């Protein structure tokens, strides 16, 4: 990525660290990373590929991750959604808004559709959660809830997707050992009002599909980037 601009956004007692990757086009893109050891660097290759196509993007490290730091127990699903909102406000993003979310970040992206207009959603190996877990701080209590058998079936994501009228791209991994394939299938099926939607399954890939997909500038990479751009442009009309 060229000409990265670092920024800090305030969220409660935390200083969220992020960066802006500029682009030629007016579309505004926010990337939300997943859980575990993930941080905004997971999006480096995807954001670079977007920049090559003229699209700028913003990403940040959630509380408990990367440069932002802090204890993961100081955050939660609702906290992560609030952190994304804080970044959107700080960067004044909002016109032709695209949100890209990976794994846990995909659920935060979905929840953002309840807070503001989002033109395009790109969900990569998306996780969804029961509402019972939404406000529970990360830690043993949160883990106990989400580890209940098929707890994700009770998610509110299906309803949210049913109300979504923008464009939707879901990228699933054929050999994902974390996210049941039913989840991306049902997200697409639930998006009955979407103006454009597509489910893309990456053959032979596991849950860590994001880095491997964009590190290798293969014909598959170019094909999937075509889908990403189509999703962004389907609603923006650019």
Model-derived regions, located:
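Conserved alpha/beta-hydrolase
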Residues: 50-69
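Conserved alpha/beta-hydrolase "acid-adjacent" motif
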Residues: 177-183
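C-terminal catalytic histidine-bearing segment of alpha/beta-hydrolase fold enzymes
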Residues: 195-238
